[in-house]
Amino acid sequence: MGGAGTDWLSVGVFAAFTAGVLVLSAMLGRRTSSAGGYFAAHGQVGWFVNGIAFAGDYLSAASFLGICGLIAFWGYDGFLYSIGYLAGWIVALLVVAEPVRRLGKYTFADALNARFRSRAVTVAAAVSTLVVSLFYLVPQMVGAGALIKPLLGLPHWAGVALVGVVVTAIVATAGMVSTTWVQFIKGALLVGLCTLLVGLILGRGFEVRDPGPPRDAPARDVGSVTALPAWAVPGGEPGPDGMVRTEGARTGPLGPVEFLRVFSASEVAAWRTSKVPAPDGTQRSVAAPERIQGNDLLLPGNSPTFRGLRSGSPLDRVDFVSLMVALFLGTASLPHILIRYYTVPDVRSARLSTVAGIGAIGTFYVLTLYLGLGAMTGGRLDTGDSNMAAPLLARGFGSVLFALISSVAFFTVLGTVSGLVLAGSGAVARDLAAAALGRLPEERMQVRVARIAALVLGAGAMALGLLCRDLNASFLVGWAFNVAASANLPALLMALFWRRATGAGVAAAIVAGLVSSLGWVLLSKDAFEKVYGLPAADALAPFSQPAIVTIPFGAAVGVAVSFLRPRSAQEHPGDGAGHPAGERAG
């Protein structure tokens, strides 16, 4: 930390945010004794509030911390995630928003099972909701742990535990009512503060700075220092160590387009990490600067994830396409996003709230490009933790902005985790409980079970956050989108738009997509290398992102089972346009 004053300021801002969230939840908790209040905020949330809450729910730790970090270290590759995340809202707007609001009530399974009244569909959808929510929870908890040390000086595990405790309090006390307002406030603050930070980046422009005293060696231990690791060079000659120094050269304020033009024409020193043998026989992580042309960093293919785009390997290219497919189709398959449609009063509000959400989310993702490049060329980077790029960039503009950005980043984690825990607890309290009992529990019992489930999910999220602390948040979310799109999208489209779909077919599509995508991810090269610590060559899956295979596989299984298994007596065909039989849009 920069000093005692900065420490206390950060602590004070953080404490104010956290206290405000807890007080809000306690006040709103009195209005959520019914299932309608707890799971859907009584269906009376305005479309604009819901739209900004969509942004607060969707713009997770991966969006803010992970993408900014990827851009800060690898350039345009990180922005590819932004493009994929935003494009997915087109599917949400054009395909699922209206029918999900029309058919569902409280959970993802409600909309999926409106036609079939099938226990198999209910159980499959509930299990899928829990698995996807847990997968998505991991990067949020990783982001929380990364933030807590520079913000409060506490260890990683303390950040994970703090998020778990606060989120459990939010969800257990007031459910969707408090979650909606936490997400609305978070979405507005995140977009507003990031806009301010980008304005400061553009106002500063580029400056060639002295990177510090000469180094005795070209590499330093990862994470041992938080240094000024990269700087743009509008001109100049290399010095003895190969670095260009024209100390004090400035561009002055730049517009958004001019900023990218100057960056493209400059040479940038970016840090790269690698592992080297240590004297004791272990592997030691070190970081060293590498000179790269700015225009090269504005092209894809620099990061390990997307390097295959330049390798010419067909499998590497398929891996990239598969990730983009998952990001594009995954948004409309995320249960914690879909249940937000139940909070608005009608179909028109569902559509308008999606448009408002797209506006806020699109604005934010454009800002991430400038945040990441600003961190690369003028901020502070922790070479051992890319997730800290945005908060450390803010520190360069003063302790107040650092405290605000870091607290909002932590608030970002709270908003997303609240939605995920609420989706999972609803699946347990309504769907699994109904399947076990053969009927829905009475409303007060549903709320009671949901609150207990929130406690269990919060504990599970904390455990997973500790196990996966060293992985990049956006990387982990890519896996979550693969699993969500594979398990949920084929089943959702079948249930909403295919007259011949049966309950058995929809349940089979969920199971096939879920099992195949999970199995593929766990057997992939990335899992072997980054999770298990094993050689990537030992992996059984040919590439890491499974959506391009597992989405069609789940759909094929669902279609085949629908043809092979006749419709049961309680099922009805629907009209193939997202309406139950006999119902039309008004």
Identify the residue ranges that each predicted region occupies.
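Membrane-embedded helix-loop-helix hairpins and adjacent transmembrane boundary segments
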Residues: 1-586
